[in-house]
Amino acid sequence: MKHPRLRDGKRLQTSELYPFNELPDDLLVNIGGYLVHLLYIGRKDISGSDWGDAFADAVGGLHLDSPVGIADVVLGKMAWSMKTVKNANPFKAERVRLISGRCSPDYSYGITDPHKDIQKTGTAVLGIWNERINIAQDNYNPLRTSVLIRSYDLLSYCIYEEENHR
């Protein structure tokens, strides 16, 4: 849906490359071509960094490839956090486990034994994640997580997106 016209004449100064979770065919073809190239040159797996490179190349964005923050690929005011997981059948996967890396309860909250109080550790990890989203949303809107589910034999792939919220 298009942005509404407002009486004060102001508009959100961002444009979405495509509607949420509706990746255009040409984008999927470009991503597929990038992944096929990696397999052709002998790659035995597709890493998270490869996924970020493939997506950035396909959208014409910049892959920050940074171990901190959640904005992995950026294009203008839009950003994506890139995740990749393996699954026996990507097209039938109903649940996947995403790892929220870049979260250190020890560093951020001084929790030296994360198993001592699981509830406290979970609350700490969620607090770190929410703060990372706050920081990313200061610079980017919309902010999405793009997940590549790949089969173990690397012959099947599925992509889906989630909007990042606190």
Short names for language-model regions:
Residues 1-69, 75, 84-166:
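Nucleic-acid endonuclease domains
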Residues 79-81:
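Short hydrophobic-acidic sequence motifs that mark active-site Asp/Glu residues
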